[in-house]
Amino acid sequence: MGLQLRALLGAFGRWTLRLGPRPSCSPRMAGNAEPPPAGAACPQDRRSCSGRAGGDRVWEDGEHPAKKLKSGGDEERREKPPKRKIVLLMAYSGKGYHGMQRNVGSSQFKTIEDDLVSALVRSGCIPENHGEDMRKMSFQRCARTDKGVSAAGQVVSLKVWLIDDILEKINSHLPSHIRILGLKRVTGGFNSKNRCDARTYCYLLPTFAFAHKDRDVQDETYRLSAETLQQVNRLLACYKGTHNFHNFTSQKGPQDPSACRYILEMYCEEPFVREGLEFAVIRVKGQSFMMHQIRKMVGLVVAIVKGYAPESVLERSWGTEKVDVPKAPGLGLVLERVHFEKYNQRFGNDGLHEPLDWAQEEGKVAAFKEEHIYPTIIGTERDERSMAQWLSTLPIHNFSATALTAGGTGAKVPSPLEGSEGDGDTD
């Protein structure tokens, strides 16, 4: 009988049985140890249960502990509001960052998303484990800007808890050169990258980049003439339409269909003077861009205007042959705006969702560019002279060469001057 009793007590773990009407507090005995005397107090870390006829167990507090834990968890989950799908309008200066996209598990190269995720967690918008696995919050960015590239109109989509004063709380945990400028609710399946119809980038550069090589001037005295500006815009307009840009990126051959991209517009605005140095802004709008593409588009036009390359190189660069296309510095590149025309047509006026046009935020976007992006680009250019250093490499390029691709038409020969950082939003 003693062995059977001990077996029963062991089966019920920490809760002890009361057999019959007499209460008992008999913990499981080891070996031949004597049970505690009658009336001894039960240890405080033990709970007892009472038995009823038929062997039913009745817990003294009236409820099975497992059920209590389960109902408590349900109650806690009910207290948390459901996450909602939103988009955030972001602006940031890319100097000092290794691009936009986060590299989970790597702290060596800091990215914009590292600071963003930290701010989302600290403000209470997402749980901490969502920062470790961004798929849990359905995170997606419109464009994957790379090392040193800034943005005035980046848009990311994600699921968050819509806490009170959400923008103020997120921004309070961000450095001043990263700002969330707007927030809108979107459909549950919205993906900022896939829903984006087009991207607009701008490239800020000193106008002495267009000075002819025979009278090259790289100081504050140079001013862009109307004739040269007209020539620049004529060449930039040649990019409009669909072309094969395999020579404007890396690791893509002429037979790769993804190398064909559609450019809606590209032009250079009137120059302006900052801190005694004249600058101009080149704007380009396209459905999507590959890594290095915009910088190489700018670089080739600069090489033509300066007299290093013939205009015919533009047409050749879209053909199947390998063409040496120079890549302008990344400092002046800025993601200015992303476009959602098709989404706005379908959902923008359905009475449930707002159109993603950000018209009310344009003032804040312009102010951020004037305060953080343009001063950083202009100041860095004056201090480091990245454009002047790059211009000195143009004579090294051989624009008349017509080398065939190695290993057949599907492989691309990498340029010896090609670096690792660039611009790209789809590849």
Swiss-Prot record:
It comes from the Eukaryota. Residues 44-79 have a biased composition (Basic and acidic residues). Pseudouridylate synthase that catalyzes pseudouridylation of tRNAs and mRNAs. Acts on positions 27/28 in the anticodon stem and also positions 34 and 36 in the anticodon of an intron containing tRNA. Also catalyzes pseudouridylation of mRNAs: mediates pseudouridylation of mRNAs with the consensus sequence 5'-UGUAG-3'. Acts as a regulator of pre-mRNA splicing by mediating pseudouridylation of pre-mRNAs at locations associated with alternatively spliced regions. Pseudouridylation of pre-mRNAs near splice sites directly regulates mRNA splicing and mRNA 3'-end processing. InterPro entries: PsdUridine_synth_cat_dom_sf, PsdUridine_synth_TruA, PsdUridine_synth_TruA_a/b_dom, PsdUridine_synth_TruA_C, PUS1/PUS2-like, TruA/RsuA/RluB/E/F_N. Widely expressed. High levels of expression found in brain and skeletal muscle. This is Pseudouridylate synthase 1 homolog. Monomer. Forms a complex with RARG and the SRA1 RNA in the nucleus. Changing residue 146 to A: Loss of enzyme activity. Transmembrane segments: none annotated. The active site is at residue 146. Residues 20-83, 407-427 are annotated as: Disordered. Its EC number is 5.4.99.-, 5.4.99.12. The modification Phosphoserine is found at residues 415, 420. One of its GO terms (cellular component) is cytoplasm. PANTHER family: PSEUDOURIDYLATE SYNTHASE, PSEUDOURIDYLATE SYNTHASE 1 HOMOLOG. It catalyses: a uridine in tRNA = a pseudouridine in tRNA; uridine(38/39/40) in tRNA = pseudouridine(38/39/40) in tRNA; a uridine in mRNA = a pseudouridine in mRNA. The modification Phosphothreonine is found at residue 426. Keywords: Cytoplasm, Disease variant, Isomerase, Mitochondrion, mRNA processing, mRNA splicing, Nucleus, Phosphoprotein, Primary mitochondrial disease, Transit peptide, tRNA processing. The lineage of its organism: Eukaryota, Metazoa, Chordata, Craniata, Vertebrata. Belongs to the tRNA pseudouridine synthase TruA family.
